[in-house]
């Protein structure tokens, strides 16, 4: 049986130091819901686990004058129960409530879900739709990048050696914005997303769309906003026909990027329907 060094970090600086011992291959752990499964499947590929779950800065949800801040070790359950997130990011709360089982939501963290970079990760579409920024700390200092540029391909995050994801930030969306997260899985509970959509938007005084964001999950090699679909919607009056056109465009864009494969016939129809439903929920119109 492989022996592992397991240490607890008391601060971000402590964690970075513990992760950067030249003679050891180190890995951070918080909830472990993905990492422990991977260890059981393939065996550990590191010598040391650095537990960061108790670092105060990684567990906070707060609002500053400029932005919302969510620590990377915040669990799905804590995020879902946050009054602040229920107010400013209901699409993220919906996504957190859809994750796995209560046991997984109580242990799994937003940061771990993003760093694992699974295309089906439930937190990625809402964070991308929120235009969230990821904050990282490492031996060379701190840096930031959009969440959409952190998880760039299936199970590959653009972390530099010895870096730690510390928190996410995003600005409040414009007043009057509504949002939603819709997930399609094999069953209602403990389901891995086959497809999902996070959407946010509002209409202005003239009754036309003046703000919209749309990010599908498990549809593309990595989660990103569909800017062409957003452009189609901006300046238009919400209607079932508009939502249908947006859904059709989303399906075409998905196929253009991924090509046709055995699952395309199903996903083409499914992503179109999810986009229509999400836009109807955001803009308050019946998609049928």
Feature annotation, model-predicted:
Residues 1-288:
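C-terminal structural segment of proteins
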